[in-house]
Amino acid sequence: MTELSTLYRPVGQAEFELVRDSDFRSFPPRLPHQPIFYPVIDEQYATQIARDWNTKDETSGFVGYVLRFSVRTEFLSHYEIHIVGSSEHQEYWIPAENLQKLNENIVGPIEVVSEFRDK
């Protein structure tokens, strides 16, 4: 049986709509100024970003979503986990050119865990 890892992705409105348009099966290509795709390991960290940052950001539409998805662990084994701040701020740095390969290794649908809006 294939081993899976659960990851989280905090996104704003535009990225959420693109994921939704894929029937919650894949993440959209990165923009030219976004060379890295950053999925995070901890739901709490993803929630912090979606709630505390995305809801204050105009380019996120003042909305933050936390998405959860499962990826084949074998795919992730080619990437290091980076700690960016405190010990629970752990994320993978996947180069934009490898995002399609990540999408091919997602198992099942991408799920919406939570939604936050600026008050």
PLM features: residue spans?
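ADP-ribosyltransferase catalytic core
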Residues: 4, 25-37, 41-93
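Active-site and NAD+-binding cores of ADP-ribose-processing enzymes
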Residues: 78-119
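Short, surface-exposed beta-strand/loop "edge" segments at domain boundaries and coil↔beta transitions
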Residues: 14-19, 73-79, 99-102
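ADP-ribose/NAD+-binding catalytic cleft of ART/PARP-like enzymes
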Residues: 1-33, 67, 71, 110-115
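Generic surface-pattern signal
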Residues: 21-24, 51-58, 104-118
